[in-house]
């Protein structure tokens, strides 16, 4: 299991475009990957789940991956978050 905390700095938070990129990144891995925000956990491979959280600027989220490729998944998600200016 691997996890990482992120502080969302993007003005628009995790809106449709970056949410889609995060879901696409997570979907490349076999691990179960969740996004935790305000006590709610959703499957990071589900665009509807991610969008339903309404993660805005200044939010603190935790992404957790469980499975054989968990470390690689967290590294790829971290890269996407940084590249897109989300965290």
From Swiss-Prot:
Cellular compartments annotated: Cytoplasm
Catalytic residues as annotated in Swiss-Prot or TrEMBL: 15 (pros-phosphohistidine intermediate)
Modified-residue entries (Phosphoserine), positions: 46
GO biological processes: phosphoenolpyruvate-dependent sugar phosphotransferase system
InterPro entries: HPr, HPr-like, HPr-like_sf, PTS_HPr_His_P_site, PTS_HPr_Ser_P_site
Keyword Amino-acid biosynthesis in annotation: no
UniProt-listed Pfam families: PTS-HPr
Keywords: Cytoplasm, Phosphoprotein, Phosphotransferase system, Sugar transport, Transcription, Transcription regulation, Transport
Recorded superkingdom: Bacteria
Residue ranges of every copy of the HPr domain listed in the record: 2-87
Chain ranges passing through the membrane: none
Keyword field contains Iron: no
Activity regulation note: Phosphorylation on Ser-46 inhibits the phosphoryl transfer from enzyme I to HPr.
CC annotations in GO: cytoplasm
Similarity section: Belongs to the HPr family.
The protein's role, per its UniProt record: General (non sugar-specific) component of the phosphoenolpyruvate-dependent sugar phosphotransferase system (sugar PTS). This major carbohydrate active-transport system catalyzes the phosphorylation of incoming sugar substrates concomitantly with their translocation across the cell membrane. The phosphoryl group from phosphoenolpyruvate (PEP) is transferred to the phosphoryl carrier protein HPr by enzyme I. Phospho-HPr then transfers it to the PTS EIIA domain. P-Ser-HPr interacts with the catabolite control protein A (CcpA), forming a complex that binds to DNA at the catabolite response elements cre, operator sites preceding a large number of catabolite-regulated genes. Thus, P-Ser-HPr is a corepressor in carbon catabolite repression (CCR), a mechanism that allows bacteria to coordinate and optimize the utilization of available carbon sources. P-Ser-HPr also plays a role in inducer exclusion, in which it probably interacts with several non-PTS permeases and inhibits their transport activity.
Protein name: Phosphocarrier protein HPr
UniProt organism field: Streptococcus mutans serotype c (strain ATCC 700610 / UA159)
Organism taxonomic ancestry: Bacteria, Bacillati, Bacillota, Bacilli, Lactobacillales
């Amino acid at each position: 299991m691997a996890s990482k905390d992120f502080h969302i700095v993007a003005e628009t938070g995790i809106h449709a475009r970056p949410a889609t990129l995060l879901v696409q990144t997570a979907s490349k891995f076999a691990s179960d990957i969740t996004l935790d925000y305000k006590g709610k956990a959703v499957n990071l491979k589900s665009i509807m789940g991610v969008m339903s959280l309404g993660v805005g600027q200044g939010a603190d989220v935790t992404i957790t991956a469980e499975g054989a490729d968990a470390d690689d998944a967290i590294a790829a998600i971290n890269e996407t978050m940084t590249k897109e200016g989300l965290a």
